[in-house]
Amino acid sequence: LQYFKEPAPQQRIIATPGQNTHIPVWLLGSSLFSAQLAAKLGLPYSFASHFAPRMLGQAIQLYRENFEPSEYLDQPYISMGVPAVVAQTDAEAEYLATSAYQRVLGLMRGQSLKLKAPVATMDGLWSPAEKMSVDNFYAMAQIGSPDTVKAGLEMLLEKYDVDEFIFTCDIYDTDKRI
């Protein structure tokens, strides 16, 4: 973090560009270690629950309990990653989400991560065990109509009391994504 400040007289490494930029630095992590480090450094913490949701609750608690105020932040500040697919209807959103499911399936199989066109059904594309793994990967996903997603986000906010959401949106059709 020192590299983003005014260089010290004996400092051998100078961030260029970067020095004296005073950019906000966050720690993005998906583990309890990253939560502890963000707390110790007094940095805002962004939990990568958009792909690794399993330890979200524990990490948030650990971060809050161990937070040390710093020159960067007076109190804990947390964001969480949320995969989101929003469409006019729940059915359309579920259809569009099959592109994201196929991407994670490819990741698990060591195949291409290129986003694929949505499919009418994932049946036959994944085994029951693979479906369970994809479901776990997307445990925080909010997929549906605007009302459905709003209700889901309100539930996440109530449960985790985060300050911000960061969204990932794996939708094949650019017009639908925007």
Describe each region flagged by the PLM.
Residues 25-28, 45-48, 76-83, 165-167:
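Hydrophobic faces of well-ordered beta-strands that scaffold small-molecule active sites
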